[in-house]
Regions:
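Substrate-binding/catalytic cleft of secreted carbohydrate-active enzymes
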Residues: 46-211
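N-terminal carbohydrate-binding accessory modules
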Residues: 1-41
């Protein structure tokens, strides 16, 4: 794991992922503020902007500043689409998909614009290259060695959300499944050092779906 300090005071990080609250983009400053406020009212301290969705608008970060919510900021990358798994529905080979996105220069330029847009928000805690799996090697190296040292040198950058810099969680498992429910006592008898970017939970289906 890693320790986090705010104004010199060590904090215990709790939080959740934020994945586009409205895919039709019917977003407003009021809606952003309400959703971040809900996060704060649950006594959560960090919110992760997940890499398979949007980078949010300044109004989102303004709300995080207001309510004291730290932001774990992913870039646009998700292990679901960059060749990490065999996928018979994809026309491109796995090797080709390792190089997604197609235009690396445009991706880097977009990251530079993003950094300039939100780097002055005190809520922004650290940068993460992608969800679960690193970006193409040349992009990752450019971000690590050139973009972030030049544009936001004081903040941490990790290549992907399950980077071993953050998590060596072998109990919850960083593998590809199949997944199941862990026995509760395991969490007290098995030593683990996680900073989990996400965790599965049991959801209750609606009654109508079971009739």
């Amino acid at each position: 794991g890693r320790r986090f300090f705010v104004n010199g005071q060590k904090i215990y990080v709790t939080g959740g992922n934020y994945i586009n609250s409205d895919w039709l983009l019917r977003l407003s400053p009021e809606r952003y503020r309400d959703e971040v406020r809900f996060h704060a009212e649950m006594n959560l301290r960090m919110i992760r902007v997940w890499g398979g969705a949007l980078v949010e608008r300044p109004e989102f970060y303004n709300a995080c500043d207001e309510f004291g919510i730290l932001v774990f900021q992913d870039l646009w990358g998700s292990g679901d689409c960059n060749g990490a798994w065999e996928d018979p529905t994809k026309m491109d080979s796995r090797e080709r998909r390792w190089e997604y996105p197609d235009n690396h220069d445009l991706f880097i330029a977009s990251v530079e614009d993003l950094v300039k847009m939100i780097r002055n928000h005190p809520s922004l805690c650290f940068w993460c290259g992608a969800n679960e799996w690193p970006l193409a090697k040349d992009i990752d190296q450019c971000l690590r060695k050139e973009v972030f040292p030049r544009l936001d040198p004081e903040r941490l950058f990790v290549s992907f959300s399950t980077d071993t810099l953050f998590t060596r969680n072998f109990l919850g498992d960083n593998g590809d499944g199949p997944y199941g429910i862990q026995e509760p006592e395991w969490f007290f008898s098995f030593r683990s050092h996680p900073f989990n970017p996400e965790a599965g939970s049991v959801g209750s289906p609606e009654v109508e779906s079971m009739r």
